[in-house]
Amino acid sequence: MFAISERVVKLLQDNKITGCKFYPITINDHEDLSYYLLAITGRCGAFDISKSKVIETIEYPETVIQNSNIVIPKGKFSVMKGFHFPLASWDRSDFFIPEDGGDIIVTECVKDLLKKYKVTNVVLENIKDMIWNSGIYPENTALNS
């Protein structure tokens, strides 16, 4: 969840940015300031791992968690580059998230607005350049072949 200022809400509304809603919130010790919860309503289809580039594969041994009966089986995970989704699944909103969750994605229009009006405390990264890990998969799973 993200809290945004009234200034940013007005900027997005004045520019008819789609795929988001705003709900007033109160931040303790800052009741005099107007902040809003940013809710993302835009969607795209699930993320397509097959189109991302594997940068590195890291193998790990079977591990027993100390003082427990938990055993993490031997396996590996991949460090990936690029985030892809079926373009036809995108509802064309300016703010959107994949149906299986994940980071907020914005259009070039939103990126340009945020930069032009010097909105702070925001990190923007091209989805083609995103680095992420595929998760840890035990040796005997299809995702680890």
What are these regions (language model features)?
Residues 1-2, 6-145:
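Phosphate/anion-contacting hairpin/loop surfaces
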